Structure formats: C-alpha cells, structure tokens
Amino acid sequence: MISYYFQGFALGAAMILPLGPQNAFVMNQGIRRQYHLMIALLCALSDLVLISAGIFGGSALLMQSPWLLALVTWGGVAFLLWYGFGALKTAMSSNLELASAEVMKQGRWKIIATMLAVTWLNPHVYLDTFVVLGSLGGQLAMEPKRWFALGTISASFLWFFGLALLAAWLAPRLRTAKAQRIINILVGVVMWLIAFQLAREGVAHMHALFN
C-alpha cells in the first residue's frame, strides 16, 4: 500500500509546486512573519478537505453543477484582480515603507478571510482536487484510496509549512524596500495573469452553457 502513498505524494507535489495565488500569499505572509504558520496550517487543512472530497466522491457534485463552477470562476476573477491591484499599488507607492506598514496592520481575521478567498475562490483548486485527483484516486479500492489521499495530503502539509518557514528565514534579505517592491510586482502580475486566464476559461465555459 505504501506505493499508493508515494503516488499520491508525487502527484500532490506536482500540482502544488507552481506559483499561484495560494503559494504567493503564504510566501508573502512568511516574509512578513505575520501569522505565517497559522496561514500554512489553514491552507493545508483546506487542501485536506478538498482532497478528501475529491477522492472520496465530491467530484460528481462539481461535474453535475456547471453553474457552480461558473460562479466560483468569476468570483475568483474578481478577487484576483482586486488582490493584484493592491499588490501593485503597494509596489508603486512613493513611500513603500509606509504602504508596507499599512499592510502589516491587517488583523488576524482579515488575513484569514484573504487566505480563504485565495483558496476557495480559485477554480483551479477544484479542478486539481475534484477532477484530477477525483478521477485518479476515485477509481481505487477503499484501502489504496486512503493511502493515495494520505500521500497527497502529506505533500500539501509539507509544502505549505516548508514555504512559510523558508520565507520567514529569508525575511531579513527579502524585507528591503527593493526586494519588497519586486515581490509585490511579482505577486500582482501573477494574480492578474491567473485572473485573465480564468476569465478566458469563464467566457468559454459560459459560451458552452448557452450553446
């Protein structure tokens, strides 16, 4: 059964490594050393719920609810555009230290709300966990399925905590004004690129719904 664990771990790692909104947010919180371990835990727990739902039967709900997928897609587009605008606005601020200080004043609950939006309003998360993992893990017998899910979840926990701790460790080098400007520009551009990609997918999806 251990082979199914490593299959799940490898697939989970392959899907989570690319830089996306969730990884960018965890990295940013790590650099700020602001609730970064709590955010890593909440991201990993969110993945646990999504992965379990996808592998153990939740994929059918998404596949049978095209309007739900469309709603999540356009909600994600709006959020990513807003979040990217905030990052670019901070990067372009004439007083970057003051702008960064304002961001640091964000309370715990606002940070948690942002993390939940970054995770649950990203339709790619549902495609990864419900469609990809659901189709591969869902066809296994119950015992191999559990090991496969455990491997995928382990990859998520290891990645998010590793990313948060690494970013916090590198924080002294990455909290300079120049580094912060580059990071905020990178985060803003990534958020907008993903938003435009989602918008294209959303338009195609809506076109398919009405035809």
UniProtKB/Swiss-Prot annotation:
Domain of life the protein comes from: Bacteria
The reaction(s) this protein catalyses: L-arginine(in) = L-arginine(out)
Keyword Metal-binding: no
Transmembrane segments: 1-21, 37-57, 68-88, 111-131, 147-167, 179-199
GO (cellular component) term, any one: plasma membrane
One biological process term in Gene Ontology: amino acid transport
Membrane topology: Multi-pass membrane protein
GO molecular-function term, one example from the UniProt record: L-arginine transmembrane transporter activity
Keywords: Amino-acid transport, Cell inner membrane, Cell membrane, Membrane, Transmembrane, Transmembrane helix, Transport
InterPro entries recorded: Arg_export_ArgO_enterobac (IPR023445), LeuE-type (IPR001123), Lys/arg_exporter (IPR004777)
Compartments in which it is found: Cell inner membrane
Keyword Amino-acid biosynthesis tagged: no
Family: Belongs to the LysE/ArgO transporter (TC 2.A.75) family.
Job description of the protein: Involved in the export of arginine. Important to control the intracellular level of arginine and the correct balance between arginine and lysine.
HAMAP family reported in the protein's UniProt record: ArgO (MF_01901)
PANTHER family in UniProt: ARGININE EXPORTER PROTEIN ARGO (PTHR30086), ARGININE EXPORTER PROTEIN ARGO-RELATED (PTHR30086:SF20)
Name of this chain's protein: Arginine exporter protein ArgO
Source species: Salmonella typhimurium (strain LT2 / SGSC1412 / ATCC 700720)
